[in-house]
């Protein structure tokens, strides 16, 4: 009886762990080092179609991630991308962080068994030269049958924290 209970417990644990992991595929550019002493601003991308507030929540999550790396980043609410940022605004910052939402799937029903999905490309530009300093892509999926992520934005923190923790000194 103890063996059966141990087996059932082990089987349940393996199934539960397999069903609650989140998978990330990360594509990073060549490593570069950015200084947390310099000034950063984050553009607010356009919302993904039919996903209200996806742009602002993405930028706010990146702002939290950068704060965890010791960077006080401002949000540029009026600018959806680097090209739209005015020269006057660029003069105030050393780097502009541009998130681009390529795919966003928010499966609202937690118990539906459907995963939240996100494909996000984050580019950091040096404002003085418009040079791309870093490009980082997060391709993430919550694979929980039982407990989905609350929102695709929840899939940003872990891979972004690891990446920016390595390059911001």
What would you call each of these model-derived segments?
Residues 1-4:
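Positively charged n-region of N-terminal signal peptides that target proteins for export
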Residues 8-16:
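Bacterial N-terminal signal peptides
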Residues 11, 32, 88-91:
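Structural motif
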Residues 16-71, 165-169:
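A structural "domain/chain start" motif
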Residues 19-38, 126-169:
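C-terminal/domain-edge helix-coil "capping" segments
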Residues 20-22, 81-133, 143-146:
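Surface-exposed short loop/turn segments
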Residues 46-52, 109-110, 144-150:
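Second-shell loop/turn segments in exported
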Residues 72-79:
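A short beta-strand-loop structural module common to alpha/beta enzyme folds
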């Amino acid at each position: 009886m103890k063996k059966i209970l141990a087996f059932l417990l082990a089987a349940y644990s393996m199934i539960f762990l397999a069903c609650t992991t989140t998978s990330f595929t990360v594509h990073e550019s060549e490593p570069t080092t950015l200084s947390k002493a310099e000034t950063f601003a984050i553009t607010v991308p356009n919302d993904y179609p039919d996903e209200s507030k996806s742009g602002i929540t993405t930028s706010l999550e990146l702002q939290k991630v950068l704060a965890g790396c010791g960077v006080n980043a401002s949000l540029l609410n009026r600018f959806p991308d680097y090209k739209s940022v005015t020269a006057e605004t660029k003069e105030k910052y050393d780097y502009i962080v541009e998130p681009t939402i390529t795919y966003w799937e928010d499966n609202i029903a937690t118990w539906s068994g459907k995963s939240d999905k996100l494909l996000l490309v984050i580019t950091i530009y040096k404002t003085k030269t418009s040079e791309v300093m870093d490009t980082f892509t997060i391709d993430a999926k919550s694979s929980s049958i039982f407990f989905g992520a609350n929102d695709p934005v929840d899939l940003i923190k872990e891979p972004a924290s690891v990446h920016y923790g390595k390059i911001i000194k």
